[in-house]
Design a protein with these regions (language model features):
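Conserved C-terminal "lid"/linker of ANL adenylate-forming enzymes
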Residues: 16, 42-47, 92, 96-159
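AMP-binding/adenylate-forming catalytic core of the ANL superfamily
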Residues: 1-107, 121
Length: 159
């Protein structure tokens, strides 16, 4: 009965708007970003709702990142690996190359922050099908999203 209104049937979309009102279509964007840096990026969560520019929380490809800095011991903590100049520079260069082809505000990546902790299935950051749950990641890591939009030196500024 249409008079009863609308019934929600399905999950809430991951898409959002930037502060400019421009829609960001997260699914395709995530795929494109990961593909552009697959050697060192396992997955990303796209942030930027109500912000001027997009940022990403980067879940690193640990093997690829370790390969970039072979001078670091194999048992060194991930935090040490992702803080290395080689990993930070490689990610910056790959994202800058991505931005050459994706320069609109809804696809251009302006900031990146590498994650030490992988997505947590117990915190619903991974779906039953093995995909990253964008909303859960951003909600659980709200402090890191805030850091992503700060002047913290760990944040990579991408041109």
């Amino acid at each position: 009965d249409p008079k009863k209104g609308i019934v929600f049937d399905g999950r809430v979309s991951e898409n959002f708007k930037l502060s400019s009102g421009t829609w960001v279509f997260v699914g395709g964007l995530r795929t494109d970003v990961v593909s552009s840096a697959a050697d060192i990026v396992q997955d990303v969560a796209i942030a930027g709702q109500d912000k001027d520019a997009l940022g990403i929380l980067v879940f690193p490809n640990v093997v690829g990142c370790r390969a970039l800095c072979s001078y670091i011991s194999d048992d060194a903590p991930l935090a040490e690996v992702i803080a290395s100049p080689e990993v930070r520079e490689a990610l910056t260069v790959l994202l800058e190359a991505y931005n050459v082809e994706h320069h609109s505000s809804s696809t251009r990546i302006a900031r990146a922050l590498l994650m030490v902790e992988p997505p947590n299935i117990d915190a619903n950051e991974i779906t039953d099908k093995g995909y990253l749950n964008q909303r859960a990641v951003l909600a659980r890591r709200a402090g890191l999203v805030k850091k992503l939009y700060s002047d913290d030196p760990e944040v990579l500024m991408i041109s």
